[in-house]
């Protein structure tokens, strides 16, 4: 149990050496911890911070009540070589972070190339950035500069001030079978059309986005900033608006006046083979996201998982 901590609760730091180097920092497990009230002296502290390490497992932790990011894994900016790879950030319960103190944060944050890294089974909610900064950067899952070769699957992110999922720029990421819902600006955002999508090997694919449930309420954007067809591979996602039904909006740039309806986005080739239907959550308005067995999302290929697996192992902490 970590409670009322001045800075990081858990801090892992190695050097950016070759993965075969005998001094590489690797094979560490951070699991089944309760982490709360971190960063009480250094407000920008992180609950679990991993720098230059591989094969680290961060799982079954409950992390809450911090002023900045809960889990952060990097640390190379852009597409340069990074020893950080094959990390597992799984089945964590993360909530009530940011709290309006700082900006540019995520429940889970990654930086740089990370082949083999998986973000899975996490529940993230109530991430709030500093309103004096325009609420900038209250993200659920935040893949920052150069984040690449990362799989994001079976996560539930909701009630985030900015976006449930945010990709600054990166390549060859897979985002599948997640629930991104009821967040402030949009549910999913990529900034890939800033001209920094292409790594040195000439690749152009920023992201595969499929089999996700994307739920808005009252016209907030489902997806934003997706004008780069070459980098954007979206298909077979489930879209719905809690208040407006099939009246769903997509932003094709950073400006609100570039918002278009989902039907027009389909014509432009930005949205492919969607299921536009109520996913039939048990009570989404009250944040109960259990799916009805007759859900059209399941019929469309979405695979439910047990949300109760997130957080510390019951009865042990």
How does the language model describe each region?
Residues 11, 57, 72, 107-109, ...:
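Structured core elements
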Residues 109, 139, 153-156, 166, ...:
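Generic hydrophobic alpha-helical scaffold/packing signal
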Residues 15-17:
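Asp-box/WD-like beta-propeller blade repeats and closely related beta-sheet repeat scaffolds
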Residues 51, 56, 313-317:
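Amphipathic alpha-helical surface "interface" segments used
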Residues 1-7, 20-39, 47, 54-68, ...:
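Right-handed parallel beta-helix
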Residues 197-317:
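Acidic, glycine- and Ser/Thr-rich low-complexity intrinsically disordered tracts
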Residues 6-12, 39-46, 67-73, 82, ...:
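Short glycine/acidic-rich loop motifs that flank beta-strands on beta-rich extracellular proteins
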């Amino acid at each position: 149990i970590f409670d009322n901590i001045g800075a990081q609760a858990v801090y892992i730091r190695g050097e950016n050496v070759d993965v075969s180097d005998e001094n590489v920092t690797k094979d560490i497990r951070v699991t089944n911890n309760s982490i709360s009230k971190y960063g009480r002296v250094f407000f920008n502290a992180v609950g679990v911070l991993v720098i230059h390490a591989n094969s680290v497992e961060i799982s079954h932790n409950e992390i809450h009540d911090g002023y900045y990011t809960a889990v952060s894994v990097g640390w190379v900016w852009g597409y340069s070589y990074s020893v950080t790879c094959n990390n597992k950030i799984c089945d964590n319960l993360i909530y009530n972070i940011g709290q309006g103190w700082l900006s540019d944060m995520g429940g889970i944050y990654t930086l740089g190339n990370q082949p083999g890294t998986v973000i899975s089974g996490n529940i993230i909610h109530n991430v709030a950035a500093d309103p004096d900064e325009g609420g900038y950067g209250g993200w659920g899952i935040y893949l920052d500069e150069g984040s690449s070769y990362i799989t994001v699957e079976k996560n539930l992110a909701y009630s985030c001030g900015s976006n449930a999922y945010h990709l600054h720029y990166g390549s060859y990421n897979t985002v599948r079978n997640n629930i991104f819902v009821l967040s402030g600006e949009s549910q999913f955002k990529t900034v890939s059309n800033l001209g920094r999508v292409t790594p040195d090997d000439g690749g152009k694919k920023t992201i595969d986005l499929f089999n996700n449930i994307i739920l808005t309420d009252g016209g907030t954007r489902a997806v934003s900033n997706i004008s780069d067809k070459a980098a954007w591979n979206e298909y077979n996602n489930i879209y719905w608006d809690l208040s407006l039904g099939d009246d769903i909006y997509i932003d094709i740039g950073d400006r609100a006046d570039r918002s278009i309806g989902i039907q027009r986005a389909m014509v432009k080739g930005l949205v492919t083979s969607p299921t536009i239907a109520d996913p039939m959550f048990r009570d989404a308005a009250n944040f109960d996201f259990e799916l009805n067995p007759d859900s059209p999302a399941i019929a469309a290929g979405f695979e439910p998982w047990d949300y109760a697996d997130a957080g510390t192992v019951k009865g042990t902490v």
